[in-house]
Amino acid sequence: MRHRLSLMACARWEADAIAEWLLYHRAIGFDHVYLYCNDDDPAALYAAVLPFLGGPAPFVTFHHFPFQGQQFHMYMDGLRRHRHETEWLMFLDIDEFLALRGGGDAHGLIDRLPPNQGCVTVNWLFFGHNFHAERPTGSVLGTYTRRAARLHATAKTLTRTACIDPDRIDRRIFFWHGWEGLLMPGAATRTVLGDDPEALPNDGVSITDDALASRMIGRAVLHHYAFRSAADLRRRWERGAGGDFHGQEMWKRVADADRVEAELAPMNEVEDRFLADVWAARMRAGAEATRLLPAPPGPNLALRRAATQSSIGPFSRGRTVAEDAAGAVNGAPTGGFQFHTAEEARPWWQVDLGAPSRVHEIRLFNGLDSPTMAARLRAFAVETSRDGTHWMIVHVAHPTDPPVGGIDGAPLCLRFPAPVPARFVRIVLRGGGVLHLDQVEVYGEAAP
């Protein structure tokens, strides 16, 4: 088979939310999505998913189904076309996100299942509108953090496709919520905890055993962002009530009766930031992974601190040693030199961090005006001192070492396994010549 674990979804008026939904479910392990567009015109949704359609192994298979609200027939078409391409298939809407609160990825729901288990059911956990009158733009996961206190009794199905025979499926059964005996003989259906879903205690709306519900939520649950604003109740009716969407007319009646906030109040009872925080952390980690340089481990203690150097020369930028040396701690790397000593034996530059500190990392940005100038920073030492008199060498560079870079993405980054106590940091050229750098950054924190 092409895929082990896939999603099938139908979407109407979801162009603004589809990208995050696809990115999220790909991130948690789904291999493919079969997406049925039910918009009158597929252009907007097609444009939104276009980045997922290309390449040798596209993440999305896109179909436009023009008959409004015919969810049953969309899914039946999908089963006939695609069920032999994937081992497992889950039916989701674009306002449903699978939350794996027990850890792992989506494959963990089907790993180690007995061969006779044909279906896993995952229950809804309704999230509210967070009291928005109109839909805000941006992330669904980051915006909606209020939810119902109780786990909903309704579930969606994750099914082994070998157990599905389309000819056995009854039109009256919404099989994406439960197969009701339509799977092949002997195929068992179980909850995420391995229980019989038909035996779950419920009042027709919610699971009534709170301890059981808590365990189910702690394993895996569907965050259902059905109403993203007060205006969404009327929006659900406006987008169409044809076919299997006929039940959406009830929300128009609620809106017309001015009962919107009362209807949505039970969905906003509890603050729950699980997916908001998980997704934000994933986005931060992804962004950090793109850095040419890792994020600094704390504040730059050298920034705009008092600095000095051994001399000034004809190419110095400042009129005094302090004025010239300050260029290397101005926080504005340029790729060129920002201080320049005279030619002399063992030229040096140093900075006073202003207070006793614990240094975790020192970064040296070389000037890159020319290869010849950059090569002058070869044989040198980095030293630290607590008092400005007694110095400890923390790094020695040799003439055979690779040249130090700078804003080209290759500065010298000295990371210390244990914090180095210091108030002063100095760079010393070990032979004769000139010393010039772009920036010196010192990361750490004040000593306790």
Segments predicted by a language model, with ranges:
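Short beta-strand/loop segment that forms part of the nucleotide-sugar
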Residues: 31-40, 63-65
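Active-site-proximal specificity loops/subdomain of glycosyltransferases
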Residues: 42-88, 100
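Catalytic-site signature of metal-activated, phosphate-bearing donor transferases
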Residues: 100-294
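Aromatic, loop-rich ligand-recognition surfaces of beta-strand-rich domains
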Residues: 297-301, 311-317, 326-395, 410-448
